[in-house]
A protein has these predicted regions:
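Ligand-binding pocket segment of bilobal, Venus flytrap-like solute-binding proteins
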Residues: 93, 100-104, 174-252
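Short, well-ordered beta-strand elements
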Residues: 46-60, 78-83, 172-176, 292
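A bilobed periplasmic-binding-protein/Venus flytrap-type ligand-binding module shared by bacterial periplasmic
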Residues: 135-146, 272-284, 307-308
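A conserved helix-loop-strand patch within extracytoplasmic ligand-binding domains
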Residues: 122-175
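C-terminal motif of bacterial Sec signal peptides marking the signal peptidase cleavage site
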Residues: 17-22
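Bacterial signal peptide processing site
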Residues: 24-27
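Pocket-flanking alpha-helical
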Residues: 65, 83-121, 210-213, 231-236
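An extracytoplasmic/periplasmic, membrane-proximal ligand-sensing/linker region
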Residues: 49, 60, 182-198, 202-219, ...
Length: 338
């Protein structure tokens, strides 16, 4: 999950396109090999033009896209391109038609995008719920709360922030942020609550995990931006810090100015994850539109594929292994042949 927004032109400089034709697998050196494709004709077939899925920079989003690509390849004869793109770039890319679909939107960080692109302009459409409820917040290992129960709430950091200090932050406690393109309001929360914490951005999900693993194994203090669902939550015993309850005022701030979020002083909103599509997708490829609309799965499903990818399995192989074990779920996604 998650993002601080940048201007579209700047964010697209960070976009890396992975053109993975759905009938091909990428080998070492960047070469591709034909894997057949063509579909089984048991489902409606794609229209022929490539379908582009946005892949945000966290492994859960990669799992969504890998499974969708594999099913569309094998069952619907589609050509699918996976495009790595920051959260901040995905709505403009769908509006322009450069991206056809994103399969995981965290709404708390996209209130302004929803208003501008879905409700006002109408060049992006809501694709329905993904089937997963997410939660962003402040997390720490449970051993810290066991040692000092005051840390269970934000008020405990009024007196204990210095326990999280590092050489980088001096007298202030370190708050470990993640990728700067995620949905992040922590600087505003810290300022609004008057806490002696400094946000230090890890730069990526992988870097945050490495920092967590190091601290956890040494039983050291760490306070971090984190979220559920996330496969690592089964590995580490984490506790979420209680922040002031989310309210409409915070929602209005996030919708109006998500970059600065000045005055945002509460928890993140609960996120019912949803999908979003280019408004032109239904006309471009009705079968792909119906498939994406039908695509839903559970936190457990996503975590199974994400963990396999994280452990080094090729995403296509991880996706296919899950598909082979969940044929009944996949069948429910397929559009009926016309």
């Amino acid at each position: 999950m998650r993002k601080r927004k940048f201007a579209f032109a700047a964010s697209m400089l960070a976009v890396s396109t992975l053109v993975l034709a759905a009938c091909s697998d990428v080998e070492e050196g960047g070469a591709t090999t034909d894997t057949g494709g063509g579909g089984t004709n048991a489902a409606a077939q794609c229209a022929g033009d490539p379908i582009t899925i946005a892949v945000n920079p966290w492994v859960g989003a990669e799992a969504n896209a890998a499974v969708a690509q594999a099913v569309m390849q094998n069952e619907m004869g589609c050509t699918v391109e996976l495009q790595e793109i920051n959260e901040s770039g995905q709505f403009p890319a769908m509006a322009s038609g450069d991206v056809d679909a994103t399969l995981e939107v965290w709404p708390s960080g996209h209130l302004k995008d929803r208003r501008d692109y879905i409700e006002k302009a109408g060049d992006v459409v809501d694709g329905g719920e993904l089937g997963i409820t997410g939660n962003i917040g402040w997390f720490m290992p449970s051993y810290l709360v066991e040692e000092n129960p005051d840390l269970a709430t934000w008020e405990g950091f009024k007196e204990n922030a210095d326990a999280f200090a590092t050489a980088e932050t001096g007298d202030k406690g370190r708050f470990l942020g993640a990728d700067t393109t995620y949905s992040i309001f922590d600087e505003a929360i810290i300022a609004s609550l008057g806490l002696d914490l400094e946000v230090v951005y890890s730069g990526s999900e992988a870097a945050s995990l490495a920092a967590l693993d190091k601290a956890y194994n040494s039983q050291e203090p760490i306070l971090m931006y984190w979220w559920t669902p996330q496969w690592a939550n089964a590995k580490y015993d984490l506790v979420e810090v209680e922040l002031p309850a989310y309210n409409e005022e915070c929602g209005a701030i996030a919708a109006e100015d998500p970059d600065a979020a000045v005055g945002y002083n509460c928890d993140y909103a609960e996120d019912v994850l949803y999908k979003a599509f280019s408004a032109g997708l239904e006309t471009k490829d009705p079968a792909a539109f119906e498939f994406f609309s039908n695509f839903t799965w559970t936190e457990e499903d996503q975590n199974a594929v994400a963990l396999s990818i994280q452990e080094g399995t090729d995403p296509a192989e991880a996706a296919q292994a899950w598909i082979d074990e969940n044929a009944d779920v996949v069948e429910g996604w397929l559009p009926a042949p016309s």
